[in-house]
Structures are given as structure tokens and as C-alpha cells.
């Protein structure tokens, strides 16, 4: 018999919940964001490569990396707090490591969920699984 304290906690927000929220959020459709997967304290979001998201040189524009990281972190937080508990970005630092010329995928993870402040990290990869950006994110729980 397994001790229930060693069992992973069930997320308070599911992939289906995230997809429903995405369908109801217009900016998500404009960006083309997709929910790839999520679990307790983490989420993975995809962003398809689209011409209107590129800069000269044919690489994804910098804010594209930040949008996918911000949304992935938003979902990661909701896996711990549920959808009714809002959290908004108060700080974000992104290191751009290489230009992406393909779809990108970001995995964000809650590092610390405080009573008011949430800290997290995110890593963004291109279609070849090369790390293209790393982000550090801070949110306030509203």
C-alpha cells in the first residue's frame, strides 16, 4: 500500500480547462497558442511559426518568446491555485539564446508559490529541441 502523501497532487486546472480558457481568450487565437500538456506546478504551451510573428531575417520576433513563456507560466500557476485565483505578471526577464525559424514550445514551472508572490522559470525550445530562450517570471496573486 502506497502512502497517500507520496502521491503526486492532482492539478487544480486541467488541459481541458486550459483549452476552454484559450477558446474564450481572443489574444490566444491571434497568437495561435496551443496547450501541449500540464501537471502540478508546470505547463507546456506551443506557438506555431507564423509569418506575422517574424522580424527581418525570418526569425520569430522577441515578444513571441515572451508571450509563450508568460502564458505557460499563467497556466502553471493555475494548476496550483485553480482558475478562480488570478495572478498577473509583475516582472519578467528573458534571455534570448538563438533565433527560432520554426514552431516553439515553452515549459514553465512554478518555483515558489507564496501567499501573494509567485516565482517561476520557463525554457523555450525550437522544433529541433534547441533551447532558444530562458525566462524568469514573477507574478502577484490578485
Regions found by a protein language model. Name each.
Residues 1-142:
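Terminal targeting signals and extreme-terminal segments of soluble enzymes
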Amino acid at each position: 500500500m502506497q502512502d497517500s502523501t507520496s502521491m503526486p497532487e492532482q492539478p487544480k486546472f486541467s488541459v481541458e480547462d486550459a483549452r476552454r480558457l484559450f477558446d474564450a481568450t481572443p489574444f490566444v487565437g491571434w497568437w495561435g497558442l496551443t496547450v501541449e500538456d500540464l501537471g502540478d506546478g508546470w505547463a507546456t504551451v506551443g506557438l506555431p511559426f507564423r509569418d506575422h510573428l517574424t522580424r527581418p531575417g525570418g526569425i520569430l520576433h522577441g515578444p513571441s518568446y515572451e508571450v509563450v513563456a508568460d502564458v505557460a507560466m499563467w497556466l502553471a500557476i493555475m494548476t496550483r491555485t485553480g482558475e478562480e485565483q488570478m495572478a498577473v505578471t509583475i516582472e519578467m526577464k528573458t534571455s534570448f539564446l538563438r533565433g527560432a525559424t520554426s514552431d516553439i514550445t515553452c515549459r514553465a514551472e512554478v518555483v515558489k508559490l507564496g501567499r501573494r508572490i509567485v516565482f517561476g522559470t520557463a525554457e523555450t525550445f525550437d522544433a529541433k529541441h534547441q533551447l532558444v530562450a530562458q525566462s524568469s517570471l514573477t507574478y502577484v496573486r490578485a
